[in-house]
Amino acid sequence: MEENMLARLMTDPAVEFFSPVIDRTVHLAQGETVRLLGVDPFLDRAVRPQLARNRPGALSFLLGEKAVLADVQLAKEMGLHSGDFLETNRGKLRLVGTFPNPSSEPLILMDIAHAQRLFGLQGKVDRVDLILNEDSGFRSRWANGFRIQSGQQRRATLSDMLRAFRLNLQALSLLALFVGIFLVYNTAMFAVVSRRKDAGILRSLGANRREVIFAFLSEILFLGALGGALGGIAGYFLSRFLTNLVAGTISNLYFFLRPVIPEWSWWILLLGTLLGCGASFLGGIFPLAELVRVDPIQALQGRTAVRGQRKMARNAALAGLAILGISLALLEASSIHVYFGFASAFALLIGTSLFTGLTLIKLGPFLRWVFNRISGLPGKVAAGNIRQNLGRTAVAVAAFMVALSMSVGLSSMIGSFRQSLVWWMSTQLQADLYIGKIGEAEVPENFYEELKSMKGLGGVDPFRNVQVSYRETSIYVSAVDPAVLQKYTNFGWLKGGNENWEPVKKGGVIVSESFYRRFKVQPGDRIVLNGAQGPAEFKVAAVFYDYSSEHGVVMMDRSTYLKTFGDHTINSLGIFIDAGNPHRKELLDEVRKKAQSLGLPVFTRDQLHGNILSVFDSTFAVTRSMRVLTIVVAFFGIAGALLTLFMERQKEFGIYRALGFSTPQVAGMTLMEGLGMGLVSFLLSIGVGTALAWVLIRVINLRSFNWTIFFYPEMGPYLLAAATSILASLGAAVYPIWKVYRTYPQMQIREE
């Protein structure tokens, strides 16, 4: 905004104090981006007293051309002292003192006049911070041409910006927790099975069923509570690592956020304990109920009753079918709120996990045929063991299937999003050079005019992107040259086509998909924006695909923007040169030199695309971490199932060896059981993971961010899931195989 409007502010009766601000960023030589505020130290004292306290070097701060103050934390991190120089992309800045900064954001202060010269903003300010004695009257007087936002509104805007991001992060965490519960369930079940003989001894000595259940359940709950408490502590330390990843993602996408070490709370311990106890109870109560119903002699002999398992598998499948029906209903309800979409994804995983028992029954003949071809009789026995011990194998397969499905679903979603982003860049960001960077430096308008008249250049697109208020929320307005974009780009159109640039040249606008979905606006509708001279009405010509902002973008001709907002600022320039121009390289070099002489950053098309993809990849670092954690959890689930089967069937193994099976053959049976469960888990994850990817892409992301991600099927996620299932199955079988080699048949069958 123009500096001369400060005179009007001084005479406004509602204004108690005001402070003009230059708000920009600079790149330090160390690679860190730091916010620089240009302020008037006398006017700013009333608005930001916390920054004015103990501010040394005031005279040097005012008189030094490139004198700055750094916040205490930033100076400490960089090892800077008064008199040192900061190397930045705007030249050397001399540190004349430090100040306490209550914010977590690294901050540099500079006198506003010096900041205006540093950024080429003579006669302009970025914003004015105010303290008012009356709000409504002030807003009515300054509504035209200015964006007025209270501190509370700004906090609400920032919270709204993070709402979808936070919601998605919480949902992914719950999915990982869902897989972890399977592990606790498996572990509790193993704890019961491994004590089967102890239960038989207690029953034979006169203990009744209630006493046995109480004794065993107390032990399981204690172990679950201990494990949950340790998990809570481990989760807290893991959060200290993940905080850096999340803060980096927020800084890249929304606003700078310095990572702060999470505070310890005893609620973490309590929550972990409750989750551990709950999962342990569910994992232990069913095998305990089975255990106390078994005759004490059978318990002493270690034999497992397998009656009714097929019926239970069919009943579980029917329950799973009902839950899948609920999942579809929740999917339909996701148009009301994205929470229903997340609930649908959970129901999908729960419902399909209940099909594992029936799947193992149906695939039993196939596994027997495959294993028989591989190793003969031991293979057939291994396939039969998987099918006959559904109470153990089905849970392990369900846990592993859910983990692999999450891996396939998340990988497919990330890969599809990345491919959609690449497609979007190839259609919309096609300039040969990009000059300037939002938040760092404005492109002088005379430089734009100079390049515009430069011979040999096909076109110059002056881009301005500014946040404005619309329907009591925030959107972005972008000013462009539609003639240049119509000639050199091929926007992805949701509704409309390249011919819709014509109405934009005549004062119309095009809107992004996120704006179209967020505000239910159709081509032909009219929208009203608050311009410099009052409300201005625009006709929507078309809707284009866009991934730059989930809050919505309204794009208009620069001439329309100037007429509406009176803002001549240019954030960046896109330079286009015809592909057949023989002097293409020389022209690009000349433009680059001119821009660099003005201190403007220059990027080639490939560099810009690479920077965007780098930000994208860092954004999903947390998602990838969670995917790895779920695989690790499921690995232990398979290992627990194999160990449980081994403990239950030690006598059976002894009989096999007494009948002539060699130790390697018995070990091979254990290995094949692990591979069989891994194979079934993988086969199920193909369908479930693809369905989960569809829900994430077409429902959750669309509802959360209001943009379309195109599904790009890739073999990578499925090959990764296949490799994971093989490696995890092999790794999970190592300990049971080791136990086979360490156990003698005469010890296993001594009671027969």
Could you tell me what each predicted segment is?
Residues M1-F178, V193, M425, D546-L629:
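Membrane transport/envelope proteins' first extracytoplasmic loop
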Residues R163-G200, L221-G235, L275-L282, G351, ...:
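Hydrophobic alpha-helical transmembrane segments of multi-pass inner-membrane transport and secretion
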Residues Y185-M189, L221-Y254, W267-R293, L321-S334, ...:
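Small-residue-rich transmembrane alpha-helices
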Residues R203, A207-L223, V306, T393, ...:
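Amphipathic cytosolic juxtamembrane alpha-helices at the membrane-cytosol interface
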Residues V292-G308, W738-E752:
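Short cytosolic juxtamembrane segments of multi-pass membrane proteins
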